[in-house]
Design a protein with these regions (language model features):
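Phosphate/pyrophosphate-binding loops and the adjoining catalytic core of nucleotide-dependent enzymes
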Residues: 1-189, 198-199, 207-209, 223
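Conserved hydrophobic "DFG−1" position in protein kinase catalytic cores
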Residues: 181, 243, 295-296
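Eukaryote-biased feature marking scaffold/signaling PDZ-domain proteins and nuclear chromatin regulators
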Residues: 185, 203, 220, 234-236, ...
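Conserved structural core of kinase catalytic domains
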Residues: 188-202, 209-213, 219-266
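Alpha-helical interaction elements in eukaryotic regulators
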Residues: 203-204, 221, 240, 268, ...
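AlphaC helix (C-helix) of the protein kinase catalytic domain N-lobe
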Residues: 204-214, 276, 331
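C-lobe/activation-segment region of protein kinase-like
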Residues: 262-268, 281-287, 291, 295-340
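Conserved hydrophobic alpha-helix
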Residues: 272-279
C-alpha cells in the first residue's frame, strides 16, 4: 500500500533531543516539532521517543530481519510519531495528479505547523499556525561573492522547473529528484541546497565549472551542471545535474560477488581510476571518495558523483580529506570493495 505521506528533511540537534519532522501530504507541507520536555508527563511515551531518537544516530546499526533486510529507523520513527496525525492527513483532499507541478509547488507548498505533546500515554498533535509557503527556511543558501564564473550556467526560477508526478502519487515529492527544464526532453537531477550548504555549494560550483572545461575535449564519467535554481530572494535552491539512471542504487549497494556481475568490477575500477586521473590532471579533487559516491547506470558504466568535499571514516582519513592523496586512499578502498 502506497504511504499517504512523503518524508522530507529530518532535523535534530547535538545540544538536545528535540527533533523536527517535515512531511508532505497531498499538496501540503506539515512541519512537526517534537520537544523532549513536552513528553515528560508520560514516562512511557518519553522512553519510546528517546529510543527512536537514539536509533537515528550515525553509529547505530539496525538488526536485520529473518530475510536479511534492515529496517529503516527513520521510517519507523515517522510511523510512530505520525500515527495520531493520520485522521488529519486523511481529511485532506487527494492530490490532483492531472495538474502540472513545479519545483515552486514542492519547495514552497502551503505549510501547516504542529507540535506534539503527551496526554495519558498518547501522542497528541497541537496545531500552531498555517502559512502560505512563500518562504522555505530549510532550503536555499545565500552565496557570498566569489570568483566563480556563473555566466556559463543558466539560472532558473523554481516556477520554470517541471516535477513529474506519478499518477498514483498521494502527495507532492518532499525532495524532488527527477525534474525537467524548459525545452529539454532529458531529465535532470535536482540536487537540493539547504540553508547551511554555503561552503559545499561554492565548492561544487567551482568543480563543475572546471568539469565543463574538461568535457569540451575529454568526456569523463561525472555529471555535468546544466543550471542553477534561484528563488525570488536570490537564494540558491539547488543544482540541476545530469540525470544518471542507476535504478536508485550506488556501487555500495551492489553485491560484487554475485555471478551476474562477473567481469564488471574490473571495468568499473578502470572507469573510476581513469576519471579520477583526468580530474587530478585538471586540478580537481573528488573529495568524499567512497563506493556510495559511485553510481552504476543501466548500461553498467561507473560515474563519480558528489563534489561537495569532506570525508567518510573508513574510506578517507580526516587529515587527507579534500586532497589528491585522500582521493587515492578512497580509490584503494573502492578497489578492496570491488575485489574482496
Amino acid at each position: 500500500m502506497r504511504p499517504i505521506y512523503d518524508i522530507g528533511p529530518f532535523r535534530s540537534s547535538v545540544k538536545n533531543k528535540d527533533t523536527q519532522l517535515n512531511v508532505y501530504v497531498s499538496d501540503k507541507h506539515f512541519k512537526i516539532d517534537v520537544f523532549e520536555d513536552e513528553l515528560r508527563s508520560s514516562p512511557a511515551i518519553l522512553k519510546e521517543y528517546l529510543r527512536q531518537v537514539s536509533r537515528q544516530e550515525p553509529d547505530f546499526i539496525p538488526e536485520a530481519d529473518e530475510d536479511g533486510f534492515y529496517e529503516d529507523t527513520l521510517d519507523e520513527m515517522h510511523d510512530w510519531i505520525l500515527r495520531p496525525f493520520m485522521p488529519i492527513f486523511r481529511s485532506l483532499p487527494p492530490l490532483d495528479t492531472s495538474q502540472r507541478y513545479t519545483l515552486q509547488d514542492c519547495l514552497f507548498a502551503e505549510e501547516l505547523h504542529y507540535r506534539v505533546k503527551a496526554e495519558e500515554n498518547e501522542l497528541v498533535p497541537v496545531f500552531l499556525e498555517e502559512s502560505d509557503g512563500k518562504e522555505n527556511h530549510l532550503v536555499g543558501a545565500q552565496l557570498p561573492p566569489s570568483n566563480i564564473d556563473y555566466s556559463m550556467f543558466p539560472f532558473y526560477s523554481p516556477r520554470d522547473i517541471h516535477v513529474a508526478i506519478d499518477e498514483k502519487a498521494t502527495s507532492l515529492t518532499a525532495v524532488p529528484r527527477q525534474v525537467f527544464l524548459p525545452g529539454r526532453a532529458e531529465p535532470c537531477f535536482f540536487k537540493i541546497v539547504y540553508a547551511g550548504d554555503v561552503g559545499i555549494t561554492l565548492r561544487e560550483l567551482r568543480t563543475y565549472s572546471k568539469i565543463r572545461a574538461i568535457e569540451a575535449g575529454n568526456p569523463i564519467r561525472t555529471p555535468q551542471l546544466h543550471g542553477i535554481v534561484q528563488d525570488d530572494r536570490g537564494s540558491i535552491m539547488g543544482l540541476l545535474l545530469s540525470y544518471i539512471d542507476s535504478g536508485g542504487s550506488a556501487l555500495s549497494c551492489i553485491d560484487v560477488s554475485d555471478p551476474q556481475y562477473s567481469g564488471l568490477p574490473q571495468k568499473w575500477f578502470d572507469q573510476i581510476s581513469r576519471t579520477l586521473e583526468v580530474l587530478h590532471a585538471h586540478g580537481i579533487v573528488w573529495g568524499d571518495a567512497k563506493a556510495d559516491n559511485v553510481l552504476i547506470d543501466l548500461n553498467e558504466n561507473a560515474y563519480l558523483i558528489d563534489f561537495g568535499g569532506g570525508y567518510t571514516e573508513g574510506w578517507v582519513d580526516k587529515g587527507k580529506s579534500d586532497s589528491i592523496e585522500g582521493d587515492l586512499q578512497g580509490l584503494q578502498h573502492i578497489k578492496e570493495f570491488l575485489f574482496p
